Amino acid sequence: MAITRRQFIKRTGLATAGTVLGPGLFSNMFVRHALAFSNRYFIVLFLDGGNDGLNTVIPVSNGSGTLRTDYETNRKTGPGGIRMTPAELNGTLVGTDGLTGGQLAIHPGFNDAGAAGASGGLKSIWNEGRLAVIQGCGYPEYSLSHEESRNIWETGNPLFYSPYTGTGWMGRYLVGNAVSAPPPYTATDIPAVNIADSVVGEYKNTGTSVLALRRLQDFGFPYDYDYPSEDAAKEIAFESLYGTAAGSGNATVKYIGNTGLSTESASQQYPQTHGVYVSARSSFNDAYTNGLNTGTARGFREIAKIIYSVERGLVSGVNARFFQLSNGGYDTHSNQGGADSNGQHYELHAEVGNAIRLFWEDLKTMGAGNTDIRNKVTILVWSEFSRRIPQNDNGTDHGSQGPMFVVGGTVNGGVYGSHPNIDPDALDNNENSPYWQGANPGPAGQHRSTDFRDVYGTILTRWLDMSQATVLSSVLALDAGPANDYWTAANFNVGFLP
């Protein structure tokens, strides 16, 4: 499929460049082009629409509290009901809540039969001890707007501190880890790829190039089929224009030039990973494409193609190690369903769980000599908000805090954080669980929230080797406000990474 010139430029971070940082910091970033190198990969999976956390990590028993009783109060049975019974959850039991000791389960969709290589979904990865379930993830003064809340999570900036407006938390990591020499990434390399139509919020930055595409085999320089005789001249002109800009003494112009050149180089290099992967791993390619045949599976297939080429050193110039993809449909105001395999929420979780499971199997033999590289990969799963605690007629409305998942070969599997207090008397005026950073439990029965920035910080420090001081000075900013109600102290040891 041909792409337009406008789309071609949009495929990298060029479209996101701007004067969003202070002049001193901005110019300093451009002096350092390369990134601190490691052999690790990091993948972000976004559940678009607001995933219902209460029906994703479900109380099965009360423990010392009333979680199960409160769940049954808020979620009904019968026509339109989305409550799940303990019997329906028996196959997806995970750990217990750290505060109350109540038994928890993940949604039965995460134990779907799937296709060959994908059976068992996320539950099977839990059984292997490599799935972390992090409860009650949120931020202060939560927003019920899809766009605003997604922007908050992507920027890591709930209170809109100006130094971080317009750039993503991973984008700031990529820029902040630039080093002078030896250069694992040059000024025109691409450290990150988004399986999307344009660069997503997490990766927006003003110092590195990020590639956005849907299918590797479709990505290429936008030749003109009506005037093919002019194609070579147009590509030469493109290289000349952006090459001149790359040599500029102006930092902004230099970045634009390097981004244009990286786009043009990527159009020659990255599509090669498709043929290499399909030829060598046809059974997995078929399992993604025909076995599961879902958008999430196809997204992981594109990531697998790149990682395979990087691990085997098969395509010169391909060295991306940071990725993002998404799965939509989680805005379940109606017809959400419960444990029924035909239900909307079940199908969404089955799609995600089966795609991750198949990718997990693919990684087992992806390394040189068919070695297992799962210990090089960490996957973070998040959504812009959870859903309201009481259900509506047959679905759920916009909510506040909810669970995150982390999958990886070095992940310490388990349940982390406290399940939100869902007692109707403990909910706020929107019938959502409030954000709380004080004593656990709080004086009004509040359960301590896991600030999503502590999850990010744990990944940045324990997976990507940033110091806590660097994270807090260049990637994430602590809040100013009462300690019980705001993120005023970091905890970058949530526990899910060694």
Where are these regions (language model features)?
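Proline-centered loop/turn at the N-terminus of a beta-strand
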Residues: 130-132, 378, 403
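Feature for exported/extracytoplasmic and membrane-associated proteins, marking the mature portion
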Residues: 2-354, 358-368, 390, 409-412, ...
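Beta-strand segments within the central parallel beta-sheet cores of soluble alpha/beta enzyme folds
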Residues: 324, 374-382
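Histidine-centered active-site microenvironments of extracellular/periplasmic hydrolases
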Residues: 383-416
